[in-house]
């Protein structure tokens, strides 16, 4: 299976079912009271994070994913069936975008996000009966479901991200730290996809995940090499470990890594420098690097030297980061409710254009082939202040008014 970390497709919620116009019928009551039921809501397209997937490969060729349509209402106040939801499993660590920006970050197993909500079912005529209007003969149409193009971007979730130039020994270090068995070789970009390993030792507070991220080269922040695909996965690690080849200009390698992380806006991330391949150095050079990189662990992934001490150091650093995160304030939760506020009336090409979420929904729900339904629509416009807003804007008898895709004459 290919490692695909990006996918783009259209999601479409199901249309809501139409309400019914029906009257109760029984012996001696040939035209009883209204009993038309409402239409069922359309199904939604829902994304769900799971640990059972590691790639977005299953969505790489999908173009449109649609949920089910709601059933129409019927007599005896029977509501239509709800449309079938479509649940799309995605790997933990998937970010969801549309043209406006980030919509969701699915960072926990089981976390869900409604990518396209189904349309609301229309009310049947039973819902419009009042003491003054005892036999309404109109209903509402179901609303269309939401539709948008989304882009999924997978960023591997890890506690520790190993970053370094090609052949710095990251894959060997991952293998030494954990039970992971990545490919290892002496050529650029041995690792073309992120590799994960779990470090689990007796006495640790909890196991932690280490990711070997594809090798970084100068210019990655501008798209060179594996470019932004590398940086995407680095951004999710809680602690970055800069793995330097101690035998090949470690000072220059650190400068390159710091510069690329800084250009990508990642310079503020918690980090630790590790000198690898120290088994290739003599005692004098080791001492020099100890002064040039004070506090940096010196390890050899090949011989295992210093690897145990490094694992314990990483575990301590992660615990410190957890304590800092627990002390940070949490953002508040905001709830948005539909409102008739924000209604706009504008003049456009000789017509008065009315815009606003609720007034556009009302127009979509109206059955324009039913005169009673049109009268109800006009009464709602008057009651909600839309007609008053049109008059204040200068609308007069016979002027064209547009609401969404609906056009009618002002009266």
Curated annotation (Swiss-Prot):
The organism's place on the tree of life at top rank: Bacteria
Protein name: GTPase Obg
Family stated for the protein in its record: Belongs to the TRAFAC class OBG-HflX-like GTPase superfamily. OBG GTPase family.
GO annotation, cellular component aspect: cytoplasm
Location relative to the cell: Cytoplasm
GO molecular function, one term: GTPase activity
InterPro entries in alphabetical order: G_OBG (IPR031167), GTP-bd (IPR006073), GTP-bd_Obg/CgtA (IPR014100), GTP-bd_prot_GTP1/OBG_C_sf (IPR036346), GTP1_OBG_dom (IPR006169), GTP1_OBG_dom_sf (IPR036726), OBG_GTPase (IPR045086), OCT_dom (IPR015349)
Residues holding GTP: 164-171, 189-193, 212-215, 276-279, 311-313
Keyword Magnesium: yes
Annotated Mg(2+) binding sites: 171, 191
CDD domains from the UniProt entry: Obg
Taxonomic source organism: Rubrobacter xylanophilus (strain DSM 9941 / JCM 11954 / NBRC 16129 / PRD-1)
Compositionally biased spans, kind Gly residues: 33-43
A Pfam family this chain is assigned to: MMR_HSR1
Function according to Swiss-Prot or TrEMBL: An essential GTPase which binds GTP, GDP and possibly (p)ppGpp with moderate affinity, with high nucleotide exchange rates and a fairly low GTP hydrolysis rate. Plays a role in control of the cell cycle, stress response, ribosome biogenesis and in those bacteria that undergo differentiation, in morphogenesis control.
Residue stretches making up the Obg domain: 1-157
GO biological process, one term: ribosome biogenesis
EC number: 3.6.5.-
Gene: obg
Keywords, alphabetical: Cytoplasm, GTP-binding, Hydrolase, Magnesium, Metal-binding, Nucleotide-binding
């Amino acid at each position: 299976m290919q490692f695909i970390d990006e996918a783009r497709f259209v999601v479409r919620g199901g249309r809501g079912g139409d309400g019914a116009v029906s009257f109760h019928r029984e012996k001696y009551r040939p035209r009883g009271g209204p009993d038309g039921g409402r239409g069922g809501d359309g199904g939604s397209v829902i994304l769900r994070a799971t640990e059972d997937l590691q790639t977005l490969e299953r969505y790489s060729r999908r173009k449109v994913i649609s949920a089910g349509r709601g059933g129409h209402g019927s007599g005896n106040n029977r509501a239509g069936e709800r449309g079938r939801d479509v649940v799309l499993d995605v790997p933990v660590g998937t970010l969801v975008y549309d043209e406006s920006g980030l919509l969701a970050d699915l960072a926990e197993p089981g976390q869900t996000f409604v990518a396209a909500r189904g349309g609301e079912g229309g009310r049947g005529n039973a819902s419009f009966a009042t003491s003054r209007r005892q036999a309404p003969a109109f209903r509402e149409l179901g609303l269309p479901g939401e539709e948008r193009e989304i882009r999924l971007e997978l960023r591997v979730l890890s506690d520790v991200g190993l970053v370094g130039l090609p052949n710095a020994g990251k894959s060997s270090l991952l293998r030494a730290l954990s039970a992971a068995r990545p490919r290892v070789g002496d050529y650029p970009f041995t690792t073309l996809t992120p590799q994960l390993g779990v470090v689990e030792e007796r006495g640790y507070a909890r196991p932690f995940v280490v990711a070997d991220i594809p090798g970084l080269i100068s210019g990655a922040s501008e798209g060179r090499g594996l470019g932004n695909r590398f940086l995407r996965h680095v951004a999710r690690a809680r602690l970055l470990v800069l793995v330097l080849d101690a035998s090949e200009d470690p000072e220059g390698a650190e400068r390159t890594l710091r510069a690329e992380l800084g250009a990508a806006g990642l310079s503020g991330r918690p980090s630790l420098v590790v000198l690898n391949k120290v088994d290739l150095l003599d005692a004098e050079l080791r001492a020099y690097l100890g002064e040039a990189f004070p506090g940096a662990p010196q390890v050899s992934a090949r011989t295992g030297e210093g690897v145990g001490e490094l694992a314990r150091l990483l575990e301590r650093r992660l615990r410190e980061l957890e304590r800092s995160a627990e002390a940070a304030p949490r953002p508040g939760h905001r709830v948005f409710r539909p409102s008739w506020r924000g209604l706009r009336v504008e003049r456009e090409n000789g017509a008065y254009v009315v815009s606003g979420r609720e007034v556009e929904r009302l127009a979509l729900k109206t059955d324009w082939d039913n005169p009673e339904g049109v009268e109800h629509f006009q009464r709602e416009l008057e009651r909600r202040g839309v007609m008053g807003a049109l008059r204040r804007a200068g609308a007069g008898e016979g002027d064209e008014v547009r609401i969404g895709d609906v056009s009618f004459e002002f009266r």
